[in-house]
Amino acid sequence: MPILYSFKRCPYAMRARMALYLSKTIVELREVSLRNKPQSMLEISPKATVPVLLLDDGRIIDESIEIIDWCIENKKDMFEDTLNKDQKLFAEDVIKLFDEKFKFHLDRYKYATRYENVDAASHRDACLDILRTLDKNINNTKCFFSNNVNKIDISVLPFIRQFRIADPLWFDANQGIPNIQIWLENFLQSKLLNVVMVNFDLWEPNNPIKLFPTNL
């Protein structure tokens, strides 16, 4: 059985857990403390970040998008819709944008005190500009391309969720992102998010095995 080292609130680990749930892949979940990472995790992934997926054959996958892609490869019908070439390219471009730019600004908005000479409001506005552009690509559907979740949805959801958490009242006001707001609210109320955000006790080597997901 694969083993997933995870941390509940980490957006990258959330990506991995959503992919595992949607692909109906059962793993042993090891919830870790980011301040006291287990030696068994550090030995297989020296970069010391979650998620880390240890496969049955000994392979290590320690990038969230690569875990999503592994799940897709092993569960061809993981997503109900088959995307066309343009949709696939759009999805990959948006995911790259979030990983390289949105996350950069999000950290400096949400955790401004950790950085020197940072104007949190300007980084918040940079995130909002990205969301306003993205908002035009959701039109009367629950997800980006249809009413069915796809790779792009689970890849950007954790970061948009964090963006809202930083100031919910501000986010929920009229910010020019009505479709994104509806899209996010749909996910916040979804079974998918409820499953992936379930609480797990911190893993210890002698603890009983905890399986994820538990309610397929």
Range-by-range predicted roles:
Residues 186-205:
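Charged/polar, low-hydrophobicity segments characteristic of intrinsically disordered regions
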Residues 200-216:
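Acidic/histidine-enriched, glycine/proline-rich intrinsically disordered or flexible terminal extensions
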Residues 133-137, 157-158, 162-164, 188:
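Catalytic cores of nucleotide-enabled group-transfer and carboxylate-activating enzymes in metabolic
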Residues 1-131, 135, 139-142, 212-215:
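GST-like domain detector, emphasizing the conserved glutathione-binding G-site
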Residues 148-150, 179-180, 201-203:
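Small/polar glycine-rich anion-binding or flexible loop at a beta-alpha turn
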Residues 146-169, 173-176:
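GST superfamily/GST-like fold recognition
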Residues 122-127, 175-189:
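Extended, well-ordered alpha-helical scaffold segments
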Residues 136-147, 192-196:
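Surface-exposed helix-capping loop/turn segments at secondary-structure junctions
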